[in-house]
């Protein structure tokens, strides 16, 4: 008699029998689709197909690579500028507390419930790293790139500062194509007006979600302060997602990063809960400094400087 190994499928396995492994393909696809549709940096940046943790590819940076043809004369050509770059992926992990009742679900039902929560945790963490440089494993972020190129501006959201922010990009011979803002900036943007000869000019188009005619996305993060604004040429930002989404479920740990109503770390055993740890690999890089600029309110900039000087 030949014994066949049972195949792990969402239809025939209860979660208490499969506390670690790879998220079933159907739900991986849904999670990744959700992540890519909702991540602000993924909406704006260029996607790179990755089969491994690192990938080297060629990008076009400068120069038209074209020339005039004149019979009988020597032709002066303009060579395009290419660069070989390597994008590196890092493992991103999220931990979500779940009721032990969920372990009685079939795998399909469990991941159907958890899929949006996993995706949201992934894209929020990735955006904070790639845009703000918060807990950033990458060598790049919009914030870091702007600072490295000397393209930071301190001040309020005003008509003049928005234009100055864009000028930082065009002065580097790049073309801004999108802004990153946040919902709390909407009133500030509406008030960023210029009055000339009794005519009020505004750069903010709330109905179409644009600033100065450029697509604008709102990042939802407490780490991005009210009054902060990014603009850039996102043709020079790349991301990739190699590998699969893995998971582990445990109920014998204390979650130091998640607190209960009393402010204390969540103890899974005491509260009859489990923790779902999901991991994915994602890469991000910016291939050209001078493609992004960053507006920071003076109060926030002063607070950051004070914290740095005191070691807090």
Model-derived segments and spans:
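Assembly/oligomerization interface modules of large self-assembling protein complexes
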Residues: 15-94, 158, 291
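Structured loops at beta-to-helix junctions and adjacent beta-edge loops in soluble globular domains
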Residues: 60-61, 99, 182-184, 279-281
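Extended oligomerization regions of viral-like shell subunits
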Residues: 153-270, 274, 280, 308-312
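Flexible loop/turn segments at secondary-structure boundaries
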Residues: 64-66, 185-189, 283-286
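Generic recognition of stable, solvent-exposed alpha-helical segments in well-folded globular domains
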Residues: 22, 26-30, 36, 109, ...
């Amino acid at each position: 008699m030949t014994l066949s190994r049972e195949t792990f499928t969402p239809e025939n396995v209860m979660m208490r029998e499969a506390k670690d492994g790879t998220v079933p393909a159907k739900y991986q696809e849904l999670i990744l689709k959700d992540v890519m549709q909702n991540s602000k940096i993924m909406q704006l940046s260029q996607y790179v197909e990755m089969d491994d943790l690192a990938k080297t590819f060629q990008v076009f940076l400068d120069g038209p690579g074209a020339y005039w043809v004149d019979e009988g004369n020597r032709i002066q050509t303009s060579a395009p500028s290419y660069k070989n770059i390597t994008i590196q992926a890092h493992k991103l992990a999220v931990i979500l507390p779940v009721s032990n009742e969920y372990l009685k679900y079939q795998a399909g039902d469990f991941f159907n419930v958890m899929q949006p929560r996993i995706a949201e945790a992934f894209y929020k963490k990735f955006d904070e790293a790639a845009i703000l440089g918060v807990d950033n494993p990458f060598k790049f972020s919009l914030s870091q790139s702007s600072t490295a190129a000397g393209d930071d501006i301190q001040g309020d959201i005003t008509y003049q500062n928005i234009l100055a922010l864009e000028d930082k990009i065009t002065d580097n011979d790049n073309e801004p194509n999108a802004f990153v803002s946040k919902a709390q900036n909407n009133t500030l943007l509406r008030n960023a007006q210029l009055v000339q000869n009794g005519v009020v000019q505004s750069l903010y188009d709330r109905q179409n979600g644009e600033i100065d005619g450029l697509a604008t996305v709102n990042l939802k993060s407490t780490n991005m302060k009210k009054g902060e604004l990014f603009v850039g040429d996102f043709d020079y930002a790349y991301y990739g997602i190699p590998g699969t989404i893995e998971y582990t479920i445990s109920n014998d740990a204390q979650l130091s990063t998640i607190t209960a109503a009393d402010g204390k770390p969540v103890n899974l055993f005491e509260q009859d809960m489990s923790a779902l740890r999901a991991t994915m690999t994602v890469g991000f890089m910016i291939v050209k400094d001078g493609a992004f600029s960053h507006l920071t309110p003076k109060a926030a900039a002063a607070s950051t400087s004070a914290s740095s000087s005191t070691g807090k």
